Swiss-Prot record:
One Pfam match: Ribosomal_S25
Gene (UniProt): RPS25A
Lineage of the species this protein comes from: Eukaryota, Viridiplantae, Streptophyta, Embryophyta, Tracheophyta
Gene Ontology CC: cytosolic small ribosomal subunit
UniProt keyword terms in alphabetical order: Ribonucleoprotein, Ribosomal protein
Protein name: Small ribosomal subunit protein eS25z
Length: 109
C-alpha cells in the first residue's frame, strides 16, 4: 500500500495571517491643523508708513506677498496695490482673474 499524502487545503481568497495572536488596531491619525494667521483688516499708521516706504522697493509685488510681509489680509493688500499704482510708485506687469503681478516703477529716461 502507498504512503498517504498530506492533504493541502485549497488556496482561499483571504490573505493568510502572518503571526499569531491579536494584531494592534490601526489608530486614526489626528489631522494637521494650520496655524491661524491674525492679519489686520484695517491699516494703522505704522503699517501704512511701512507699506509706502518698503513696498515700492520690492522686485515682485503681489497681494499674497504684501499680505505675508505686512500681516494684512488679501482684500486690504489689493486695495494697497491699487493705491500704490495711482501714486505711480509701482507698475503692473500682468493681471489675471485671480492674481495681479506688479513691480517697482523704474524711470526709463
Amino acid at each position: 500500500m502507498a504512503p498517504k499524502k498530506d492533504k493541502v487545503p485549497p488556496p482561499s481568497s483571504k490573505p493568510a495571517k502572518s503571526g499569531g495572536g491579536k494584531q494592534k488596531k490601526k489608530k486614526w491619525s489626528k489631522g494637521k491643523q494650520k496655524e491661524k494667521v491674525n492679519n489686520m483688516v484695517l491699516f494703522d499708521q505704522a503699517t501704512y508708513d511701512k507699506l509706502m516706504s518698503e513696498a515700492p522697493k520690492f522686485k515682485l509685488i503681489t497681494p499674497s506677498i504684501l499680505s505675508d510681509r505686512l500681516r494684512i489680509n488679501g482684500s486690504l493688500a489689493r486695495k494697497a496695490i491699487r493705491d500704490l499704482m495711482v501714486k505711480g510708485t509701482i507698475r503692473m506687469v500682468s493681471t489675471h482673474s485671480s492674481q495681479q503681478i506688479n513691480t517697482r516703477a523704474t524711470c526709463l529716461t
